From Swiss-Prot:
One of its GO terms (cellular component) is membrane. It comes from Mycobacterium tuberculosis (strain ATCC 25618 / H37Rv). The chain crosses the membrane at residues 7-27, 41-61, 90-110, 120-140, 181-201. One of its GO terms (molecular function) is methyltransferase activity. Gene3D superfamilies: 1.20.120.1630. This is Methanethiol S-methyltransferase.
């Protein structure tokens, strides 16, 4: 019974992630979904800035603290290791859904590209960014990243085994193509409002800080293998002179 509950929990967490990820595209792009970065709850500008920063902070703290090895060691004293990743994914998704629900509109326009070719180019970059995010997850192990492999192994009664480090496709050009895709998607917009700008700056700043912690953990886990990889491949921008 426990094995079935484990895989049901992992699948449910993944479904919540899919909802949060799909909504993120509409939220940032201001398309399809009812509440977006440009059309959310009306509020005075001061209140909007504070609330939006708190929402970004909640996601940042959850996402970074729960990803650290020290927290994982403590957390798995209470949560079975097989669902640790699924729980992380679930809580990160809930933090995003909270952000979508409580975001405050900041409607002042920073830029508005009216030239058709410019709009098409920016929309193309927007979709390219999201496509990069999604496809990059499969270039490592999508199912491991979102906890499905862990719960599947538990369901089968098999021990968990680490997946070795390999740099495939985009990972041969940048160390963090998922984060690169997010940054491109957050900034590529024909119309940048103050709210969207706050979101883009906050999210990009968080990514740059969080990557420092991620790199430290990877160095600790992989040692010289990752140290050599860092020397050969840029973190976010695919500089050709570093690629070998």
């Amino acid at each position: 019974m426990k094995r079935y509950l484990t895989i049901i929990y992992g699948a449910a967490s993944y479904l919540v992630f899919l909802v949060a990820f799909g909504y993120a595209i509409g939220f940032v792009g201001d398309v399809v979904v009812p509440r977006t970065v440009d059309h959310a709850i009306a509020a005075p500008i001061g209140q909007a800035v504070v609330v939006n920063l708190v929402l970004l902070g909640v996601f940042a703290v959850q996402h970074s603290v729960m990803a650290r090895q020290g927290f994982k060691r403590w957390w798995t004293r209470f949560v079975p290791p097989s669902i640790e990743r699924s729980t992380y994914v679930l809580l990160a998704s809930v933090a995003l859904l909270l952000l979508y629900w409580q975001w405050r509109t900041m409607p002042a326009v920073i830029w508005d590209v009216r030239q058709p070719a410019g709009r098409v180019a920016l929309w193309a970059l927007f979709w390219l960014g999201w496509a990069t995010v999604l496809t990059s997850t499969f270039m490592i192990n999508h199912f491991e990243l979102f906890g499905l492999r862990q719960v599947y192994l538990a369901w089968r009664g098999k021990p968990y085994t680490e997946i070795g480090f390999q740099a495939h496709l985009l990972y041969r050009w940048v160390r963090h193509p998922i984060m690169l895709g997010f940054v491109v998607a957050f900034w590529a917009t024909p119309m940048m409002t103050a709210g969207h700008l706050l979101f883009a700056i906050g999210a990009t700043g968080y990514i740059l800080v969080a990557l420092q912690f991620e790199e430290r953990d990877l160095l600790a886990a992989l040692g010289d293998q990752y140290r050599d990889y860092r020397r050969e491949v840029s973190m976010l921008l695919p500089w050709p002179h570093r690629h070998t």
